[in-house]
UniProtKB/Swiss-Prot annotation:
Keyword presence, Transferase: yes
Subcellular location, principal: nucleus
Organism in which the protein naturally occurs: Glycine max (Soybean)
Compartments in which it is found: Nucleus
Record InterPro entries: DNA-dir_DNA_pol_B, DNA-dir_DNA_pol_B_CS, DNA-dir_DNA_pol_B_exonuc, DNA-dir_DNA_pol_B_multi_dom, DNA/RNA_pol_sf, DNA_pol_B_thumb, DNA_pol_palm_dom_sf, DNA_pol_type-B
PANTHER family assigned to the protein according to its UniProt record, in alphabetical order: DNA POLYMERASE CATALYTIC SUBUNIT, DNA POLYMERASE DELTA CATALYTIC SUBUNIT
MF annotations from Gene Ontology: 3'-5'-DNA exonuclease activity; DNA binding; DNA-directed DNA polymerase activity; metal ion binding; nucleotide binding
Protein name, entry field: DNA polymerase delta catalytic subunit
Length: 1088
């Protein structure tokens, strides 16, 4: 070997040694970091199990949150006579001590019913069993199940459909091996099966569409969110733990003790609620994509149910981050470390409920797909089952009440994912569902103002800039928790689950009908009734006449109008007349059954139902129980002192009210679980009859001939209420007459139908059917509020200008009693619109996207815009279920409205002019005329024509320097300008300093999207101060919001000085920013 070769070998050895040492140091560092993280996480684990639980010597009592099932091998010890794959029910919950529970329930089997053919005996059943087993084996050739049809039993049941004089008849209960085989078996029976002596026969199936978990809950008398007990000695610790729960055990379903949610068992367990948010570093001009863009921060807040403040606050950051007071900042060097740390955090903290805003559509799917791209196979194990990965799939939810929405279903086994965005869309009608807008509306709080376009810059900065981003991320995790508490979602949803008997997750993922069906199945089971499949039940065709609305006598009433309301009208009708599936007599049976005429109710729509003396209906029984329970809950609520108990009781009474009102809709849903138009049409026909009856009695009794001062006049009737003008001038007198009328008329109705007096409107503006406004009085001393129905103050699809204009006019007319002032106010607003002095945010229209563009028969403005936005940037374009904000722009003459709709941000950034005439003719004119026509003789001529409509200015948003519009008047220059949104800006600039800042920069600075789409704020003014921060000039913008809200919002954005000097304004304390604006400064407007 030469000397040169020796040196080469030595170099290789040294290099290999160095590489080895580097790898070893990396491994050691990774181990140290993991150990440090484990030590950190250990503080946040659940309390340890007591000796009694460990030794299985004490009973287990827990509140269940989630129920599902899994297919696994039969438990040999609990079920010695069973083998092969079976369905095992899993119940997840929490004990009162805060221990997590996974209860594996064995022995419950799926089943359904068919009507037994006449003359079928035990031998025939055995042969039928063999034939059905053979057909099942053919249909499921790839299955490893030993026996598909476990057994067939003859039982005595009766169909819920139609009145029958016999108590019961033979049914066959078919028990199958696995839940998925119910549908397979049903299909075989629907198509027909060859039977000896009967030939090819098809069978009507009963309860074959009941979900397996719900079937289990019904048969075991378990309702959503209730407490379940298992006595000591009746459960066995799972031999090999399959979950991460502290308590995991197996038991037979017959050993479960289900407690009704009353008294001590109405309380809530200390659930752990995790609220989280993620931030991603997107590329410039692109919405973050998990295939390219890293997750840079994850903020977490964990709260115990019933407590105000989180007991865990942390943020996991990629790279260093400066400390945040009260927050555990956890920096990591790589994205892989961030994701795995969050996975470990989830496992250690073990949350029962995971919340956030849009987490099901964005945060969770993004994390899962990002980990997949980084090849972190172990990341998606976020549920409570070992080695089980989170599953994400696209879903489309559609119902008449909630509309159609595209989303994603995220299955985190053993935990409830509670997406606040989805809940807000289901429960509230808002113009905008952005987190900023919703938080502003309900909490008077807003997000930290960091525009998405600078997130990557903040991440690429230093520890201080990443701290700013972390505060932003933490706020986005904090606001959903505040919304959850403020709106009492946990209490309300748990109570709804308890009342209706469905799992909590069903309330989030399904419509209304499953809740009524659950109650119906429970009551039917108690009475040995069975429910046929929906498609074969009741009437499938036809429509029925809706509720009566008495002709509205439009006008402006300056005397009190008493309102008489029916208490729970539709539920009361169903109870009073015993309307139910099982009390309905079909025409062909009416003569055969030979029912005495006095024992039936013939409804105004021509249907026949037996009275309760022959058979009490199930629907009336359910309604009676719900309404009685609601009265009890409301009475308990008045007596309750504990805030948590009050929250539970209030949630319960609300759930009971909603459930009672849902029953009628369930019967009328033609594509529902069990439609029956005979019931729904009978209910509405009785309602129409009662409204007419009430009108006649009021106008017959309250007359001058009967000694009253004036003749009463019914000016309007709407579904379940009647408006009466008794002619008196005093509110108190109208109230007394209203009470007298309600008591007199109630006595003429069948109980429990009751007419109640609740309120007086004074004054009252009746515009047309379903449209009115008035001051709402429940006490004679003072009015409670201004109440409106069907007009633009409560409609979401009008621009904010219309809502504000209508609301302010009504305020002047009804409260100020200043009609001339209201007229002048409208003229001023129209003039401002035509002269381009109107805030752009007031012109934004929002509409829901319920279908894709191809599914609409007629082209719509918001739909066409959504398609154009999708072509520009598919990632940020609206999806089905979103609300689309847009404005109408100037275009060629004859262009359709759908061709002129445009994204407000796009309009601002591209200096596109707005079409004021569209807004005048299509947005303002009709709502304003509806209000003023009952008041003014020539409303159209006075309001929409005249000198205030003759001056028109069309200017576009400018992108040149903002000082182009100002004149130098003082050393400290003060300007007000019209900047697209027409907020008022007051810019304070150091002497001789010049600011160069484009409209586009201001758009970023002010986060315009936060305020577009009618977010609920009317921005009156703003101040911009320029100070030095991080060695660069920074603009701090203060918004002065509507005085009633007192919101103070400020953002920071770098600005460029053009004179090359280093002169800046003095540094202001933040408190100095909250000064009132000078409102006397003259406008300086751009000229077209």
């Amino acid at each position: 070997m030469t000397q040169e070769e020796e040196f080469m070998d030595e170099d290789v050895f040294i290099n290999e040694t160095l590489v080895s040492e580097d790898e070893e140091s990396l491994i050691l560092r990774d181990i140290e970091q993991r150990q440090a993280l484990a030590n950190r996480l250990s503080k946040w684990t659940r309390p340890p199990l007591s000796a009694g639980y460990v030794a299985q010597s004490r009973s287990v009592l827990f509140q269940q949150l989630e129920i599902d099932y899994v297919i696994a091998e039969s438990h040999g010890e609990l079920l010695p006579n069973s083998s092969g794959p079976v369905a095992i029910i899993r119940i997840f919950g929490v004990t009162k001590e805060g221990h997590s529970v996974c209860c594996n329930v064995h022995g419950f089997e799926p089943y359904f019913y068919i009507c037994c053919p006449p003359g079928m005996g035990p031998d025939d059943i055995s042969h039928f069993h063999q034939t059905l087993e053979g057909r099942m084996r053919e249909a499921n050739r790839n299955s490893n199940v030993g026996k598909f049809v476990r057994r067939i039993e003859m039982v005595q049941r009766r169909s819920i459909m139609y009145y029958q004089q016999s108590n019961s008849q033979p049914f066959l209960k078919i028990v199958v091996a696995l839940p998925t085989m119910v549908a397979s078996c049903r299909g075989i029976l629907d198509r027909g099966i060859q039977l000896d002596g009967l030939g090819m026969k098809s069978f009507l199936t009963y309860e074959s569409n009941v979900l397996f978990a719900l079937r289990f809950m019904i048969d075991c008398n378990i309702v959503g969110g209730n407490w379940i007990g298992i006595p000591a000695g009746k459960y066995k610790k799972t031999a090999k733990s399959l979950s991460y729960c502290q308590l995991e055990f197996d038991c037979l379903y017959s050993e479960l003790i289900s407690h009704a949610p009353e008294g001590e068992y109405s309380k809530m367990a200390p659930f752990r609620i995790l609220s989280f948010d993620i931030e991603c570093a997107g590329r410039k001009g692109h919405f973050p994509e998990p295939t390219h863009d890293p997750v840079i921060q994850i903020a977490n807040l964990v709260t115990l149910q019933g407590e105000d403040q989180p007991f865990i606050r942390n943020v996991m950051t990629l790279k260093s981050c400066s400390p945040i007071v009260g927050v555990d900042v956890m920096p990591f060097e790589t994205e892989r470390e961030v994701l795995l740390a969050w996975r470990d955090f989830i496992r250690e903290v073990d949350p029962d409920i995971i919340i956030g805003y849009n987490i099901c559509k964005f945060d969770l799917p993004y994390l899962i797909e990002r980990a997949l791209n980084l090849k972190i196979a172990e990341f998606p194990i976020l549920g409570r089952i070992r080695n089980s990965r989170v599953r994400v799939k696209d879903t489309t939810f559609s119902s008449r009440q909630y509309g159609t929405r595209e989303s994603k279903e995220v299955a985190v086994e053993g935990r409830v994912t509670f997406d606040l965005l989805q809940v807000m869309q289901r429960d509230y009608k808002l113009s905008s569902y952005s987190l900023n807008s919703v938080s502003s509306h309900f909490l008077s709080e807003q997000k930290e103002d960091v525009h998405h376009s600078i997130i990557s810059d903040l991440q690429n900065g230093n520890a201080e800039t990443r701290r700013r981003l972390a505060v932003y991320c933490l706020k986005d995790a904090y606001l959903p928790q505040r919304l959850l508490d403020k709106l009492m979602f946990i209490y309300n949803y748990v109570e709804m689950a308890r009342v209706t008997g469905v799992p909590i997750s069903f309330l989030l993922s399904r419509g209304q009908s499953i809740k009524v069906l659950s109650q119906l199945l429970r009551r039917a089971r108690q009475k040995n009734l069975v429910i046929p499949n929906a498609k074969q039940a009741g009437s499938e065709q036809g429509t029925f006449e809706g509720a009566t609305v008495l002709e509205a006598r439009a006008g402006f009433y300056e005397k009190p109008i008493a309102t008489l309301d029916f208490a729970s009208l539709y539920p009361s009708i169903m109870m009073a007349y015993n309307l139910c599936y099982c009390t309905l007599v079909i025409p062909e049976d009416a003569r055969k059954l030979n029912i005495p005429p006095e024992s039936v109710n013939r409804t105004p729509s021509g249907e026949t139902f037996v009275k309760s003396n022959l058979q009490k209906g199930i629907l009336p029984e359910i309604l009676e129980e719900l309404l009685t329970a609601r009265k009890r809950a409301k009475a308990d609520l008045k007596e309750a002192k504990d805030p948590l108990e009050k929250a539970v009781l209030d949630g319960r009474q609300l759930a009971l009210k909603i459930s009672a009102n849902s029953v009628y809709g369930f019967t009328g849903a033609t594509i529902g679980q069990l439609p029956c138009l005979e019931i729904s049409s009978s209910v509405t026909s009785y309602g129409r009859q009662m409204i007419e009856h009430t009108k006649k009695l009021v106008e017959d009794k309250f007359t001058t001939l009967n000694g009253y001062e004036h003749n009463a006049e019914v000016i309007y009737g709407d579904t379940d209420s009647v408006m009466v003008q008794f002619g008196v001038s005093a509110v108190e007198e109208a109230m007394n007459l209203g009470r007298e009328a309600a008591e007199h008329i109630s006595g003429t109705f069948t109980k429990p139908i009751k007419l109640e007096f609740e309120k007086v409107y004074y004054p009252y503006l009746l515009i047309s059917k379903k449209r009115y406004a008035g001051l709402f009085w429940t006490k004679p001393d003072n009015f409670d509020k201004m109440d409106t129905k069907g007009i633009e103050t409560v409609r979401r699809d009008n621009c904010l200008l219309v809502k504000n204009l209508v609301n302010d006019c009504l305020h002047k007319i009804l409260i100020d009693r200043d009609i001339p002032g209201a007229v002048q106010y409208v003229k001023n607003a129209i003039s401002d619109l035509l002269m381009n002095r109107m805030d752009l945010s007031l012109l934004v229209i929002t509409k829901g996207l319920t279908k894709t563009g191809d599914d609409y028969e007629v082209k719509a403005a918001h739909v066409e815009l959504a398609e154009r936005m999708r072509k520009r940037d598919a990632a940020t374009a609206p999806n089905v279920g979103d609300r689309v904000p847009y404005v109408i722009i100037k275009a060629a003459k004859g262009a359709k409205a759908y061709e002129r709709s445009e994204d407000p941000i796009y309009v601002l950034e591209n200096n596109i002019p707005i079409d004021p005439h569209y807004y005048l003719e299509n947005q303002i004119s009709k709502p304003i005329l509806r209000i003023f026509e009952p008041i003014l003789k020539n409303a159209s001529k006075e309001l929409l024509h005249g000198s205030h409509t003759r001056s028109i200015s069309i200017s576009t948003p400018s992108n040149s320097g903002i000082l182009r519009f100002a004149k130098k008047q003082l050393p400290a220059l003060v300007v007000k300008l019209y900047l697209a949104r027409v907020i008022t800006l007051s810019v304070h600039i150091a002497k001789e300093g010049r600011l160069s800042c484009t409209v586009k920069q201001y758009l970023k600075c002010l986060s315009w999207r936060c305020f577009l789409g009618g977010c609920g704020h009317s921005v009156r003014s703003a101040k911009v101060h320029f100070i030095r921060m991080f060695s660069a000039p920074v603009g701090i913008v203060q918004f002065s919001i509507d005085e009633k809200r007192h919101r103070k919002i400020w953002v920071k954005q770098s600005c460029n000085w053009t004179d090359g000097t280093s002169k800046f304004c003095q540094e202001f304390d933040l408190a100095d920013l909250f000064e009132p604006m000078d409102t006397n400064t003259i406008w300086c407007l751009p000229q077209s």
